């Protein structure tokens, strides 16, 4: 473990793969966008399971149409395509809804909903 900002009790340990924080909360590394970007699988009591993609997949449109973000965010487009496949496999495995990092339509759709 390493200290953050030289604060001895505030530490972190690099992770690779999945890290189960609780039965209903799993962190996972994502293989696109930037090194170290983390996704979250959250299992809720009354509303099913959710996968949060953070910055790895920006929008539902990008996810469904396999449209990688522009520029040099990913090393290659294949890196993005491979990651979308991973998320789709997780979505099927956990019967989960996917929450995208920058989707204004999804924000509007879910803006006033409470999930527990």
Task: For every predicted segment, state its role.
Residues 16-18, 33, 104:
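Short, solvent-exposed coil/turn elements at secondary-structure transition points
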Residues 25-31, 51-54:
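Active-site-proximal beta-strand elements of phosphoester/diester hydrolases
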Residues 28-40:
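Active-site glycine- and acidic-residue-rich loops that bind
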